[in-house]
UniProtKB/Swiss-Prot annotation:
Keywords: NADP, Oxidoreductase. It is an enzyme of class 1 (oxidoreductase). One of its GO terms (molecular function) is D-xylose 1-dehydrogenase (NADP+) activity. The record marks 176 as: May play an important role for the adaptation of the alcohol substrate into the binding site. Its EC number is 1.3.1.20, 1.1.1.179. This is Trans-1,2-dihydrobenzene-1,2-diol dehydrogenase. PANTHER family: OXIDOREDUCTASES, TRANS-1,2-DIHYDROBENZENE-1,2-DIOL DEHYDROGENASE. Pfam families: GFO_IDH_MocA, GFO_IDH_MocA_C3. Signal peptide: none annotated. The record marks 180 as: May play an important role in catalytic activity. It catalyses: (1R,2R)-1,2-dihydrobenzene-1,2-diol + NADP(+) = catechol + NADPH + H(+); D-xylose + NADP(+) = D-xylono-1,5-lactone + NADPH + H(+).
Length: 335
């Protein structure tokens, strides 16, 4: 049976997600509805992507009995309201990262999903890329020896992109880019809670975080560090180092197709998307997470074993602690 998707928000990421879904077999995935807060935008989106139904409110999509799973592609401060709306209506939910602006928002969403027994997942699409799965295998086999350190960087000049610097919309590098780096470190160290978190950072003139470096000390004397920036170009790579060697995910590390293990290059090409244009790099790679959601639902799972909800909560806790350390608060934070 095809999984029937409803797309919440008609923005750029939703467009890429929908373009990708339409490339997958119709026997497995179908987009049945889209909702925007402006009906004309929803209709335009529906026309572009050949979606049967367009709604001018998220409520209408949540109530649509044809929708099995809602994809939440709004800006992050709007995630919580949209997620709760869809969960209350009995829908499974795939919510874009970061799940929430702060830990309290994430806990509220997770509690709602659990109390209703509904599938809920944070769309950390990176984890499902074959290059990242290959890295996990390398780690599981002990190829790198005893692990010592994970390092990640994600930065580019986004100061011309309004949402990146918009304080009211919880912009900045940490929630948008840093979460990719952080989830890599967390993945390598098995979703453990860090023993110590330290951070330094620069504020952007709008009040969001501009460039931040974080060090995370984990049990067993291992650590991870990452730098994220919305104003400077960084290497956009991840390295995992141990006593027997190093593995690297090359740029673009958030949607990687190349893994280097002890100097040996391996390529993992994306599925073909002939004639399709994406707003974001390697957009067709979202297909890996979409397939995962379908598999989880077919198995009757309520959460992903690859990105469990407890880890989404942990990532939110760490990002909040980092923001406190560098003095960044957003209007969504409860003071």
């Amino acid at each position: 049976m095809a999984l029937r998707w409803g797309i919440v928000s008609a923005g750029l990421i939703s467009s890429d997600f929908t373009t990708m879904l339409r490339m997958l077999p119709r026997s497995e995935h179908q987009v049945v509805a889209v909702a925007a807060r402006d009906l004309s935008r929803a209709k335009e989106f529906a026309k572009k992507h050949d979606i049967p139904k367009a709604y001018g409110s998220y409520e209408e999509l949540a109530k649509d009995p044809d929708v099995e799973v809602a994809y939440i592609g709004t800006q992050h401060p709007q995630h919580k309201a949209a997620v709760l709306l869809c969960l209350t209506a009995g829908k499974a939910v795939l919510c874009e990262k970061p799940m929430g602006v702060n830990a309290a928002e994430v806990r509220e969403m997770v509690a709602e999903a659990r109390s209703r027994g509904l599938f809920f997942m944070e769309a950390i699409w990176t984890r499902f890329f074959p290059a990242v799965e290959a890295l996990r295998s390398v780690l599981a086999q002990g190829t790198l020896g005893d692990l010592r350190v994970v390092r990640a960087e994600f930065g580019k000049n986004l100061t011309h992109v309004h949402r990146a610097t918009d304080w009211a919309q919880a912009g900045g590098g940490l929630l948008d880019l840093g979460i990719y780096c952080l989830q890599f470190i967390s993945m390598v160290f098995g979703g453990q809670k860090p023993e110590k978190i330290s951070a330094v950072g620069r504020r952007h003139e709008t009040g969001v975080d501009d460039t931040v470096t974080v060090i995370l000390q984990y049990p067993g004397g291992v650590h991870g560090s990452f730098t994220c920036s919305i104003s400077a170009q960084l290497s956009n790579t991840v390295s995992v180092s141990g006593t027997k060697g190093m593995a690297q995910l090359l740029d673009p590390c958030w949607s990687p197709t190349e893994l280097v293990v002890k100097g040996e290059h391996k390529e993992f090409p994306l599925p073909p998307a002939p004639g399709k244009e994406f707003n974001f790099t390697n957009g067709m790679g979202m297909s890996y997470e979409a397939k995962h959601v379908r598999e989880c639902l077919q198995k009757g799972l309520k959460e992903s074993p690859v990105i469990p909800l407890v880890e989404s909560e942990l990532l939110a806790d760490i990002l909040e602690e980092v923001r406190k350390a560098i003095g960044i608060t957003f209007p969504q934070d409860k003071h």
